[in-house]
Amino acid sequence: MTPQTLNQKLTAAHIPPDLIDKIEQMTAQSKSNPLLVEPTQKYINMMLSLPWDAVTRDTLDLSGARAILDKHHYGMGVIKDRILEYLSVLALKARGQKEGSRAPILFFVGLVGTGKTTLAKAISEAMGRRYARIPFGGMGSALDLRGQSRVHPDAEPGQLIKALIRAGSKNPVVLLDELDRVAESTRADIMGVLVELLDPEQNVRFVDHYLDYPFDLSQVLFIATANNTKNIATAVLDRLEVIQMPSYSDEEKTAIGRDYVFPKQLTATGLSNETLIIASDVWPLIVRPLGFDAGIRTLERTINAVCRKVAREIIEGKSKKVEITKENIKQYLPSEVG
């Protein structure tokens, strides 16, 4: 690639002029040192992949947002109202009424399976923004977030920069998932990076060690989740608005299973509501096969297992249509609960 072609590519990607100068210097140095060719090309490709100027346009329509939330989540009236208030603040900010309109960072806290991650996805869909998730479970180093210096042979950017590349936009919804599950040995360092990420005074010039150049994160919409707040640093909590997720009652889980999970699993397994029917008095047996469960993970797995067994039965020619009743439910429940 000629210097002129490289310059044109970098300029077209809206890379800042001083960074273009730096890249061109690196390229010139690599010509006299073969060992620098591969890492320099890797760096250039990474810079070209970053969404320096790419943004999506928000669709902040509250009635549409409510419909999306209702489509994905049963009940949760208080939480949905809080999310709509949150979106209203963002809408006012977008109109230019910025004074006092900075939206806090939502922090969904609750047991596994209570809908934290899917709420974040629903917010992304409601806003028309792209979505990326950063899992914190078992994260063992602050470098996982901030990246490694290019002096290391296998250096890479941190999870945040990778998330932006995956999203392909500068303003995605980024889910910081399970903040409470980072490795204990590096918790303090990771929390320190989080403070910087979530602080609007600092994240406008976030420096990933691999990039070695400030990147503006001010348009990223961060949402966080955790099972509890016990292991979250106070400085991080101060930047988050905790929203406690409720546990589901059996009646709520019945409605969720019947009206939300079951139709999705029918589609996922190639069935229809004509080939698989579940009698209404069977749902209590499906909802609580293992005793108390605050979330719906067990419910989702159980319904999925039932659908898979029916799909196999139909493919093997044993049935054309299956109706599950109290009399035959046990043969369709997964073995660990049947």
Q: For each of these PLM feature ranges, what is it?
A:
Residues 176-215:
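Conserved catalytic/switch belt of AAA+ P-loop NTPases
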Residues 101-104, 127, 146, 154, ...:
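Short loop/turn elements that form and flank the Walker-type P-loop nucleotide-binding site
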Residues 106, 174-177, 224:
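Hydrophobic positions in the central parallel beta-sheet of the AAA+
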Residues 126-156, 163, 183, 252:
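AAA+/P-loop NTPase substrate/partner-engagement loops
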